[in-house]
UniProtKB/Swiss-Prot annotation:
It comes from the Bacteria. InterPro entries: AAA+_ATPase (IPR003593), AAA_lid_4 (IPR041445), DNA_helicase_Holl-junc_RuvB (IPR004605), P-loop_NTPase (IPR027417), RuvB-like_N (IPR008824), RuvB_C (IPR008823), WH-like_DNA-bd_sf (IPR036388), WH_DNA-bd_sf (IPR036390). This is Holliday junction branch migration complex subunit RuvB. GO terms for biological process: DNA recombination; DNA repair. Belongs to the RuvB family.
Length: 334
């Protein structure tokens, strides 16, 4: 799958850029106000008791700040953080090596925790509950169990698929926090802050326009801002103006709802070739040349959230709003 401007997942070249933009304290974190308020209380209470924070599960769509929040938690607790991904923990020994290296109160952040293997997950249970590991060494008749005591720590797990977590793992998290899509006001504030970090001026209209087209996701907002800045610098403008912003977003094929060429391709397929549906997901996948799982996990959620697409027992169906928007878009494109 080609990388899209509106893809909510991180592009390979964006790691350093995102790191430079991440806030380090809760007071700097824009949006997710309910989560911030709760975390402030939980962190303050844990510090008053001189205990590590309860294990935290962060879940929601990609690009909303789960990794950023995990680092903020460590900073607010004044402890170190160790970051790993679920798929990288292939064997119990991988987990044991990391956990045994933690200091009291440290944070272990496991991204994509829903992708932990069942073997590693079972070893994690006593570590989360009672802070010890039971590791089997040797094979057959020579196999023996070794208990490793661990310092109290906080596990922060992040997932885009909370429903894929097993019940026993999910229940061991004391704090469950769902990150929601950002409103346009918060995205506008994020865009203005990012422009300051980049050393680029931006007018308010441009910040509002970018916020509208960012799919409720800071990662998308920052990516679009970077590309619009390219046009501004080539034009040798003193700052980013609305005319440049609209021109750039038009060339990038990101419309006023944050939909791109793939969204248009998929919806036009349903509307034009299959009379608006219902049409099966496999049929759509073959018609537009994309994998079923990519359509289901990447393209569909935002179209459904915006009210353009319905999932029915008989297949996918375009809504009246989709007919209105995509017919108008097709007319504008000629």
């Amino acid at each position: 799958m080609n990388e899209r401007m509106v893809d909510q997942s991180m592009h390979s070249e964006e790691t350093d850029f995102e790191l430079s933009l991440r806030p380090t304290r809760l007071r700097q974190y824009i949006g997710q106000n309910s989560i911030k308020s709760n975390l402030e209380v939980f962190i303050k209470a844990a510090k008053l008791r001189h205990e590590p924070l309860d294990h935290v599960l962060l879940f929601g769509p990609p690009g909303l700040g789960k990794t950023t929040l995990s680092n903020i938690i460590a900073n607010e607790m004044e402890v170190n953080i160790r970051t790993v991904s679920g798929p990288s923990l292939e064997r119990p020994g991988d987990l044991a090596a990391i956990l045994s290296g933690l200091q009291p109160g440290d944070v272990l952040f496991i991204d994509e925790i829903h992708r932990l293997s069942s073997v590693v997950e079972e070893v994690l249970y006593p570590a989360m509950e009672d802070f010890f590991l039971d590791i089997i060494i040797g094979k057959g008749d020579e196999a023996r169990s070794i208990r490793i005591d661990l310092p109290p720590f906080t596990l922060v797990g992040a997932t885009t698929r909370a429903g894929s977590l097993t019940g026993p793992l999910r229940d061991r998290f004391g704090v469950h926090l769902r990150l929601e899509y950002y409103n346009e006001s918060d995205l506008k504030e994020i865009i203005i802050r990012t422009a300051e970090v980049l050393g680029t001026g931006i007018d308010e209209e441009s910040a509002i326009e970018l916020a509208k087209r960012s799919r409720g996701t800071p990662r998308v907002a920052n990516r679009l801002l970077k590309r619009v800045r390219d046009f501004q610098q080539v034009n040798e403008d003193e700052q980013i103006y609305i005319e440049t912003t609209k021109h750039a977003l038009g060339l990038l094929q990101v419309d006023q709802h944050g939909l791109d060429y793939i969204d248009h391709k998929m919806m036009n397929c349903i509307i034009k070739q299959y009379n608006g549906g219902p049409v099966g997901l496999d049929t759509i996948a073959v018609t537009i040349g994309e994998e079923r799982i990519t359509i289901e996990d990447v393209y569909e959620p935002f179209l459904i959230q915006k009210g353009f697409l319905e999932r029915t027992p008989r297949g996918r169906k375009a809504t009246p709003l989709a007919y209105e928007h995509f017919a108008k878009s097709n007319e504008e494109r000629g």
